[in-house]
Amino acid sequence: DGYYYPSSGQAASVAECLLMEAKRLGIVIHTDSPVTQVKNKNNEFIAVTSQGEHFESRVLIIAAGSLAGMKEGKLTDPQDFCRTLGLKVQPTVPALTALVQEKDTIGKIWSGVRVQAAVALISDGKCMSKDKGEVQLTDYGISGIPVFQVSRYASYSLLKKKKTEAVIDFMPSMTKNELLEELRVRAGFTDRSAQGQLCGLWNSKLVHALCKKARIAIDRPMRLADCDNLAALAKEYRITITKTNPISQSQVCAGGVDLREIDPSTMECVNVPGLYLTGEVLDVDGICGGYNLHWAWATGTIAGKAAANKIGKQRKNR
C-alpha cells in the first residue's frame, strides 16, 4: 500500500537504531531531565530542566514534538516554549485518533467488530475528508486507520462547534443498487430468519446492529421492503461525533507553530535568530504510514545542519 514500517513490526526498532547511532557519534543524552522553561536573554537561549539544570547556548533546536501519547500533566507543552519566545501558534488538537459517537445502544452490539468500510467526515453538511480500509467498531464509537486519517478534521470541526458526523459505508465494494439486488436475492430464502439470510455478508454482530437500526426483526425473514432500508443504511450509516479520544490517546497533534514563522530552507525562526523548530512542534501533520516520522527526520536533518553551520560561523568570527 506504499506505507513503510520496520519489518519487525515494532516502532521501538526505529528508536533503538537512532540511539545506537547517537552513541556511536558520542552524543550525550540527558534522561529524566524534562525541560520546564526556555528563555531568550541577550541572544542567548537558556533551557531550565525539572532537575534545576541550566543549559545555555546561542543556538536552540526545539524538537520536542507534542503532548500526543503523553500522560496528561506529566510534561510541559512544547508549544508553551514557542509562545514564550513570541511565536504564533495555531491551536493544537488530537489527530490520528479514534472518534467518540453520541451515546447509542448499537455500540454495545457491534463492539469488537473489524470490517472493511469507507468513512467520510462531515462538518456542517460538508465532506471534509474520506478514507477506506479496516474500521474497528467499539462500544464508544469508531477506530482504525481510516478513522485516524479523517480524525484531524473532526477535531477542528468540534473545536469550531460545528455539527460533526461520520458516514460509514459498510459495503464499499458494491454500489447501492448492487447491494440492494444482493439483499433481495437473500430475502428470497423465506425459510430463514434475517440473521440466516444475511449470514456471510457481514460479521454476525454487525448484522444484528444494522437490523436493529433498520428496525428489522433479526429472528424473522426479511421482507423486500426491508431490503431498501437496509441497503440505504449500510451504504450511509451516519453517526454523530461528540468528541475524539484525548491527546494522550492520539498518535499526533494537528496545529502548532505557524509555518510563516520559519525559513523552510534552514528551519530557523525568521524573527528569533538562532532558534530552530522541527517536526510536530510545527503546524504540519500527516496521515498514517510514516509521514509524520519523515517530517520529523527531514526537518531535524535540515535544522541540525543549519544550526551546526551557524555555530561554526560564530566560532570563526570570534
What are these regions (language model features)?
Residues T31, V207-D285:
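A glycine-rich dinucleotide-binding beta-alpha-beta segment and adjacent secondary-structure elements
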Residues S66-F81, L85, V284-K313:
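A conserved FAD-binding loop/helix module that cradles the flavin
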Residues V59-T105:
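Glycine-rich loop(s) and the adjacent beta-strand/alpha-helix scaffold that form part
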Residues S7-A15, K23, A95-K103, T244-E261:
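Flavin (FAD/FMN) cofactor-binding core of flavoprotein oxidoreductases
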Residues I29-S33, P91-V93, N245:
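Short loop/edge segments at beta-strand edges and connector loops
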Residues K88-V93, A98-P221:
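An anion/pyrophosphate-binding glycine-rich loop and adjacent beta-alpha core
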Residues D1-V59, V207, C211:
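Feature captures the FAD/FMN-dependent oxidoreductase FAD-binding
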Residues V35-T36, H54-K71, C82-R83, V135-Y140, ...:
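Short hydrophobic core segments
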